[in-house]
């Protein structure tokens, strides 16, 4: 396995690399990331994993500086999975100008759901993913469904900007108690970690009500928020939306997703659950 730090070197490698499946990450890899790598391996001759903590997608007061950087441990895990290349550029390599002059802005989604609480986040995501697609030139790219809004943004920019890459969504990896795997779970105290699976349980309760025919979307959302709040969560949102586009759900929609974001102590957790109605 090669660890490549420059765009020039990666492009030289890419010329003779056959088909490439790509998994972009910010490092600090866990089993959820490795599931993406395993899916990528099924789909191309070579797998490239990028590791880059992207300042542009962190808001003021977020955890950019304390976000764990664990390149050597990550590289060891990826080598064991048979990855061909780890692309680990530094900030100057990916953003040579102090200020990025041109950005990719996803207007329809950047101010909704997580975007409402993290201004500029999805502009940062869309910009860095566009840059990485141009550098890596993958045939396939794998993204986890845990970051559902991010996945929707990336699907949209891939279609609208004509990137020649197949986007492969991969199911959310979960701990045995249902908690979605996330690098931020390590910030939870022992008591918070015990409480954290409640977020997924609330999503399942909403899904169950929808499956039983409830059309009171606002009422279901409100009950989930109240339940989480009672147990000490600070809830950003619980919302029922249309799958893929994330448009507001309407009565009669058959493919739905319920999404949630909430803070437990100082840690912000997100999760979602897709629902197909008969």
Swiss-Prot record:
Entry GO CC: cytosol
Enzyme class: ligase
GO biological process: pantothenate biosynthetic process
Residues noted as binding ATP in the record, renumbered to the chain: 26-33, 144-147, 173, 181-184
E.C. number(s) listed in UniProt: 6.3.2.1
InterPro entries registered for this protein in UniProt: Cyt_trans-like, Pantoate_ligase, Pantoate_ligase_C, Rossmann-like_a/b/a_fold
Binding site for beta-alanine: 57
Residues annotated for (R)-pantoate binding in this entry: 57, 150
Catalyzed reactions per annotation: (R)-pantoate + beta-alanine + ATP = (R)-pantothenate + AMP + diphosphate + H(+)
Pathway info: Cofactor biosynthesis; (R)-pantothenate biosynthesis; (R)-pantothenate from (R)-pantoate and beta-alanine: step 1/1
Family from the record: Belongs to the pantothenate synthetase family.
Entry function: Catalyzes the condensation of pantoate with beta-alanine in an ATP-dependent reaction via a pantoyl-adenylate intermediate.
Miscellaneous notes: The reaction proceeds by a bi uni uni bi ping pong mechanism.
Protein name as it appears in the record: Pantothenate synthetase
Species this chain originates from: Neisseria meningitidis serogroup A / serotype 4A (strain DSM 15465 / Z2491)
